[in-house]
């Protein structure tokens, strides 16, 4: 047993990691400025670059819509990513290639359902039932609070200090998915 003080410090450091993430530019900005607002701006620039790349690879905008909807999808606590709620009228089989591309480019982590996890995943993987996670937990936090100008420092501070009243299970789910990749 490490004691409560050490546990609190380790959890705070872990939450700081969840906020900053592991993108080299975001980490460098935090080390340089110790300012979560500056880090958020760096991560927003990275999100914009991802979205530009998605448009180059898929000019329909579906990849961008799928990526931007990751936080909303995870917060629903559903067993799979619901394509039609991210892109009205769309179906999983029609975006399978886009989802695979996002996974291969490591901009997102895709966890496919398996019909029988006791045998090789490739044999039982269900390409139409999956969850999509952000590849970086810091990017996920920026996506989740993207609707606000500089993800109000209040949100960052509350999340860092474990004082945010929202259920953050989906943030932890994303960070665990990142760790398992």
Q: What do the PLM-derived regions correspond to, one by one?
A:
Residues 1-22:
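Amphipathic alpha-helical segments of the small helical/lid subdomains adjacent to P-loop NTPase cores
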Residues 16, 23, 27-181:
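Accessory nucleic acid-recognition modules appended to NTPase machines
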């Amino acid at each position: 047993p490490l004691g409560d003080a050490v546990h609190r410090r380790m959890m705070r450091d872990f939450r700081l990691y969840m906020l900053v993430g592991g993108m080299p530019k975001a980490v460098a900005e935090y080390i340089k400025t110790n300012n979560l607002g500056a880090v958020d701006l760096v991560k927003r620039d990275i999100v914009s670059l991802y979205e530009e790349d998605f448009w180059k690879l898929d000019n329909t905008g579906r990849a961008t819509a799928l990526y931007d909807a990751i936080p909303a999808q995870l917060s629903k606590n559903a067993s799979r990513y619901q394509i039609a709620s991210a892109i009205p009228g769309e179906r999983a089989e029609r975006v399978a290639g886009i989802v695979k591309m996002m996974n291969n480019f490591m901009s997102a982590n895709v966890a496919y359902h398996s019909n029988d996890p006791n045998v090789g995943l490739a044999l039982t993987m269900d390409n139409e039932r999956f969850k999509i996670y952000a590849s970086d937990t810091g990017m996920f936090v920026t996506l989740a609070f993207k609707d606000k100008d500089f993800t109000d420092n209040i949100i960052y501070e509350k999340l860092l200090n474990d004082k945010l009243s929202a259920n953050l299970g989906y943030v932890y789910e994303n960070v665990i998915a990142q760790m398992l990749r």
